[in-house]
Amino acid sequence: MRLCDKDIEEWLERKELIIEPYPNKTLINGITVDIHLGNKFRFFYEHTGSCIDLSNSKIIGGLSLTEIMSNEIIFSKEQPCFLQPGSLVLCSTFESIKMPNNLVGWLDGRSSLARLGLMIHATAHRIDPGWNGNIVLEMFNAGKLTLVLRPKMRIAALSFEVLSQPVLRPYNLRKEAKYKIQNGVVPSRIHKE
């Protein structure tokens, strides 16, 4: 069962679901909570490696994964981020989310932004039960024009679904979970698989 706006408010008030900072009620509508773009970004460098072998996370051409991506860059609220057509950037949400063990979250982009070419997540849009931390967005500009992004702009919406019972292995208790208590923009950790 998906939570409606009234349910979301009740889960937040009971602190079963935690979103920090606590969302203003104007951001909770229908079945979603609007969330904002954070100020931490990671960009891909132009490089000479021809491809990444996803079976072993090696870049053909001798580079490592850390060499193809910038360190985390922190933008001020006034500082724009320019996302060129055909470019991918990793960035974090402004909000931090703590999920209970009996709730799954779903991240969706905003239709108005998608109509301009902005994809909010490449594939990872599920927020697992037991998740705790910022959400990293894999944003892609599929449009023809450069998109200007600014920290704290409304960027996406979260919806929540109640599970039939609490999960046996919540994300925060899994030994192999690669992104526990994520703060900021954590790059791919495929090499830890």
Curated annotation (Swiss-Prot):
The active site is at E138. HAMAP family: dCTP_deaminase (MF_00146). Belongs to the dCTP deaminase family. It catalyses: dCTP + H2O + H(+) = dUTP + NH4(+). Its EC number is 3.5.4.13. Keywords: Hydrolase, Nucleotide metabolism, Nucleotide-binding. It comes from Buchnera aphidicola subsp. Acyrthosiphon pisum (strain APS) (Acyrthosiphon pisum symbiotic bacterium). Homotrimer. Pathway: Pyrimidine metabolism; dUMP biosynthesis; dUMP from dCTP (dUTP route): step 1/2. GO terms for biological process: dUMP biosynthetic process; dUTP biosynthetic process; nucleobase-containing small molecule interconversion. This is dCTP deaminase. DCTP binds at R110, S111, S112, L113, A114, R115, D128, V136, L137, E138, Y171, K178, Q182.
